[in-house]
Amino acid sequence: MAMKIGLLFFSCFCFVFAHSQDSPCIKVQFIYGSKPLKKYKHTEKKWFGGIHGGHVGIEGDSDRIYSFEIAGKNKVFGGRADNCAYRCVTPEHFWSIMKTKEDSLKSTTIVIPLTVPQKHKLDSITRAYIQQVPYSYAVFGMRCAASTYEILAQLGILPEYSRFKTTMKIFYPRRLRKRLLYQAEKNNWTVTRKEGTPKRKWEKDV
């Protein structure tokens, strides 16, 4: 009898372990916008976008983050996709994009569980985007937040909009972050936050 119970327990453990191994997830990584406090303006760097700037990317696999970045002259409006790149980068690259030490950054990580078909679709999208970016990087167009939203919408995590509507609604990372934090609370997703250096004024979520 004890042996049967032991075998049953072992079988259940193997099932749970196998199920957990087959349950992929992504981490949406946010760097908050900020600007130097007045007394540190000579030592702290100014960032593109300032308090409403920052950056966001999707960590799909361990030690690899998908990041939509400018790689040429900035455009005011969209056009040919000749000034940007969709990259699969290391965490070191991602967290250094603002030319500020990682431990000085204010950040939030939102862990989103995926189904296996969603993970396959993400892999397909990112492979295609790395080979050929489907849009340019523009001030009034697609940037990191709108691009990340568009991919999450393709996965069925957020509502899909037209590209124009996406750029208007998700103009900078905070707008995407607020939507995902709402979904995180609703769906019990894991959220990890880190405070930034007190030498800068940081964007808030409320």
Predicted features and spans:
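Glycine-rich catalytic cores of cysteine/serine-nucleophile enzymes that process amide/ester linkages
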Residues: 22-106
